């Protein structure tokens, strides 16, 4: 019996591994079909030089699953200002930031950039206006230099390094065995979370687009990395139209405008000072996070 079992073990193990591979392949095929079946976005208009204000005008949006995410969202993110999106989880912050760059087309209302409807702008032209710094950084199995150069494929090594220094990438690059030419592994597996974020910010510096979409990415970082990234971001956003997803209220205290999203609508908007005095949703969130921080310190 034991002899039979020992002879069956390897074939059974191989069969189970193959079954797992087939299941994984089916999932991947389904994802690929979803991408291939997605309608190609159209748009032929070129941007006129009317600035880079982003305006949401009674925007409604639902995913293909039928899940309504935004019901009636209206606000303006002005050029030269930082507009922070805050609110409870599931309120629509991430969706709003991605709709601004036309990741998806909306169901109703209108989104404009510089007065032009984004649904009528050539998609490639529209995306050229945005530098995107989100929490999920996509890096490639290549050198630090080449990963940053994605921000501007025509940039020289000197330009790439200059952008990297603005993002404080040089602080860790100089410690690596091959410096700027160090291979960082698949998806940056050789780097820490803070180092990955700094490469993402360096790309944005290199691209130098007039609009910044920023997902606050310092929540899980240590104090040193958080300080370095906040310093880099303060340089990056100067004189830009900035739309930032905020998870911690203390990081947006210096924003020009706060837009509070809740249940797919704008619950309130205004300066941080005005909203704190209003004693509404934003003030309540600030109070809760302050109390939570004090409790941790205690």
For the regions a protein language model found, what residue spans apply to each?
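ABC-type nucleotide-binding domain
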Residues: 49-298
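Pre-NBD coupling/linker segments of ABC/ABC-like ATPases
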Residues: 36-49, 275
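Generic structural signal for alpha-helix termini and adjacent loop/cap motifs
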Residues: 18, 38-39, 278, 288
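Membrane-water interface of transmembrane alpha-helices in multipass transporters/channels
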Residues: 1-2
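Cytosolic ends of transmembrane helices, especially the final helix of ABC transmembrane type-1 domains
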Residues: 7-35
């Amino acid at each position: 019996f034991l002899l039979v079992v020992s002879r069956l073990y390897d074939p059974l193990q191989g069969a189970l591994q193959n079954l797992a591979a087939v299941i994984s392949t089916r999932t991947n095929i389904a994802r690929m079909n979803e991408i291939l079946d997605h309608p190609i976005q159209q748009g032929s208009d070129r941007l006129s030089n009317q600035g880079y204000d982003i305006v949401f005008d009674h925007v409604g949006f639902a995913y293909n699953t039928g899940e309504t995410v935004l019901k009636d969202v209206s606000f303006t993110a002005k050029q030269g200002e930082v507009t922070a999106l805050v609110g409870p989880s599931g309120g629509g912050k991430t969706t709003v930031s991605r709709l601004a760059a036309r990741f998806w087309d909306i169901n109703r209302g209108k989104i404009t950039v510089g007065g032009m409807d984004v649904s009528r702008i050539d998609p490639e032209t529209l995306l050229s206006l945005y530098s995107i710094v989100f929490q999920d950084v996509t890096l490639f199995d290549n050198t630090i230099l080449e990963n940053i150069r994605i921000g501007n494929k025509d940039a020289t090594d000197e330009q790439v390094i200059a952008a990297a220094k603005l993002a404080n990438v040089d602080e860790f690059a100089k410690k690596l065995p091959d410096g700027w030419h160090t291979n960082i592994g698949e998806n940056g597996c050789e780097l820490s979370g803070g180092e990955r974020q700094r490469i993402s910010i360096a790309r944005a510096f290199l691209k130098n687009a007039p609009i910044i979409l920023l997902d606050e990415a310092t929540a899980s970082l240590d104090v040193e990395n958080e300080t370095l990234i906040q310093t880099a971001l303060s340089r990056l956003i100067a004189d830009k139209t900035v739309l930032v997803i905020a998870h911690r209220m203390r990081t947006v205290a210096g924003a020009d405008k706060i837009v509070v999203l809740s249940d797919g609508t704008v619950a309130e908007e205004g300066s941080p000072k005005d909203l704190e005095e209003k004693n509404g949703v934003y003030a309540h969130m600030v109070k809760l996070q302050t109390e939570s921080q004090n409790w941790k310190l205690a």
